């Protein structure tokens, strides 16, 4: 079942953020603003630090768009802190790192690999009402390109602010949108 258009389910977890150390995060923290939740398999691994560092490179631009980023793995918040303190790539991360050792959040977002107990590579864009608007899931060996998140967020924000309009493929801010109607069926 697709999670697109569904509200984030209740959860409670411990998180780490540079400068704040440990604190609790719940689904309520994802409401009232745009959020991106980035699931990844494991701390102290190979592709994961490259992805998380890539998200960090886009973090300032995402913040300008009113977006908060949360990364999640089935590691504990303690392991996140240790990784942050020991990895040059992960040490640059300013956004929130949620620990999901109970696998609750990974299971709720349907990214838990039940055989390994690890999260798949999943990216979720969530609107201010806590509703999932976009999902991307990648195989274990395929890292994500965080630069595509900026445009996806802008498109999701545009569609939310302009009911009745949709963003076509390769849409960019200021670009032409579509207004679905019978008049354009078969003419695109």
From Swiss-Prot:
Keyword vocabulary terms for this entry: Antioxidant, Cytoplasm, Disulfide bond, Oxidoreductase, Peroxidase, Redox-active center
Example GO biological process: hydrogen peroxide catabolic process
InterPro entries in the record: AhpC, AhpC/TSA, Peroxiredoxin, Peroxiredoxin_AhpC-typ, Peroxiredoxin_C, Thioredoxin-like_sf, Thioredoxin_domain
Cellular component terms per the entry's GO annotation: cytosol
Enzyme Commission identifier(s): 1.11.1.26
Lineage: Bacteria, Bacillati, Bacillota, Bacilli, Bacillales
MF (Gene Ontology): NADH-dependent peroxiredoxin activity; thioredoxin peroxidase activity
Family, per entry: Belongs to the peroxiredoxin family. AhpC/Prx1 subfamily.
Catalytic-site annotation from UniProt: 48 (cysteine sulfenic acid (-soh) intermediate)
Remaining remarks: The active site is a conserved redox-active cysteine residue, the peroxidatic cysteine (C(P)), which makes the nucleophilic attack on the peroxide substrate. The peroxide oxidizes the C(P)-SH to cysteine sulfenic acid (C(P)-SOH), which then reacts with another cysteine residue, the resolving cysteine (C(R)), to form a disulfide bridge. The disulfide is subsequently reduced by an appropriate electron donor to complete the catalytic cycle. In this typical 2-Cys peroxiredoxin, C(R) is provided by the other dimeric subunit to form an intersubunit disulfide.
Originating gene: ahpC
Catalytic activity, as annotated: a hydroperoxide + NADH + H(+) = an alcohol + NAD(+) + H2O
Pfam families: 1-cysPrx_C, AhpC-TSA
Domain spans labelled Thioredoxin: 2-158
Protein's name according to its UniProt entry: Alkyl hydroperoxide reductase C
